[in-house]
Amino acid sequence: MKMFKSLSLLPRIVSPFQKCYSTDLISLVGIPRVKITKGQNRYLLVNIHTHGFTKYGRVIVRGADVDNHLTVFDSILEELEPQGICAKILGGGRILNEADSKKIKIYGTSRTFGSADHTRTRNILHSWTTYKDFKITVKN
């Protein structure tokens, strides 16, 4: 009988951990995988994760028409830090987004963060519904 009483305490012990992990994962899923503007962008390929849980990350693409990749990185931090999400830059480059003709060209490298895996970036863009029908070319 004592064993059943101790087992009845199990949900009380597990519940706080379950809530903690599930809310962290929900906050990751709520972040859009792609944010780029029309025209020429400097972009970063970023692995995001909740603090302490690097194993359960997600790769996102962020780009903007700015002077350098550090400005893109600063905007990423402004977006993610209030939610307690950490970012690790995997590399960068440029994206030419011709939305009218449904073409995207991924090329170049970031002097600050090194070159991103452009093929991986292309796959992420293709998985996003906005860019599913676009012709995406990669130039290394």
UniProtKB/Swiss-Prot annotation:
The active site is at H69 (proton acceptor). GO terms for cellular component: cytosol. Substrate binds at R42, S110, R111, T112. InterPro entries: Janus, Janus_sf. One of its GO terms (molecular function) is protein histidine phosphatase activity. GO terms for biological process: cell differentiation; sex differentiation. The keyword Flavoprotein does not apply. Keywords: Differentiation, Sexual differentiation. PANTHER family: BCDNA.GH02250-RELATED (PTHR12258:SF5), JANUS-A/JANUS-B (PTHR12258). Belongs to the janus family. JanA and janB regulate somatic sex differentiation. This is Sex-regulated protein janus-B. The gene is janB.
